[in-house]
Amino acid sequence: MSSSSPSGSGSDLTERRGIPAAKFIQDVETYLSQSGLDPNSALAFHQERLQQYKVVEMKLLAQQRDLQAKIPDIEKCLEVVATLEAKKGTGEALLADFEVSEGIYSRACIEDTDSVCLWLGANVMLEYSCEEASALLKNNLENAKASLEVLVADLQFLRDQVTVTQVTIARVYNWDVHQRRVKQVTPTAIAVADS
């Protein structure tokens, strides 16, 4: 999103996490004269900016989907660790069905255990004590929820910028159509007055 702003004063624009804010154009004629653009160039600039916003929105939505899928997995892991901690010391074995492959399950009998293995990603698994695993999973859950809140706020900011940009495009287009009609009417009015 590093294209230059034709508004003439880039200091008015703020941004949120690298997403530039769209500036509402109050007076199209003043905007065009200050930026030195003709209506077609201004429309092209704002349509390009709109496309950039759409690309960023798709990336943020993908991140949001990933986080929304990750949070239930972390919660499920926390429940399993809590169950293992609760069964520890009782002397009874825990029967668990786990998925080996898609649609293929196996049954395991888990005796008293002091540790669990967690997938950390990138084909890395580490063994943790139940307490450490629980603390790590709680921390990961808090981080994922905080990241999701930030993403939701970023998406709302982005949607606001898309709306402002769409309104700006409509205003510039309508102003251009109005100016063309005025130019067409003026020669016709002069021709009628001359005859």
Curated annotation (Swiss-Prot):
Induction section of the entry:
Accumulates in response to cold.
Task: Give yes or no: UniProt keyword Nucleus.
Answer: yes
Q: Which Pfam families match?
A: Prefoldin (PF02996)
Source organism, top-level taxon: Eukaryota
The N-acetylserine modification is found at S2
Q: Which GO terms describe its cellular component?
A: cytoplasm; nucleus; prefoldin complex
Q: Name one GO biological process term.
A: mRNA processing
Similarity section: Belongs to the prefoldin subunit alpha family.
- Which protein are we looking at? Prefoldin subunit 3
Q: Which organism is it from?
A: Arabidopsis thaliana (Mouse-ear cress)
Which taxonomic lineage is given here?
Eukaryota, Viridiplantae, Streptophyta, Embryophyta, Tracheophyta
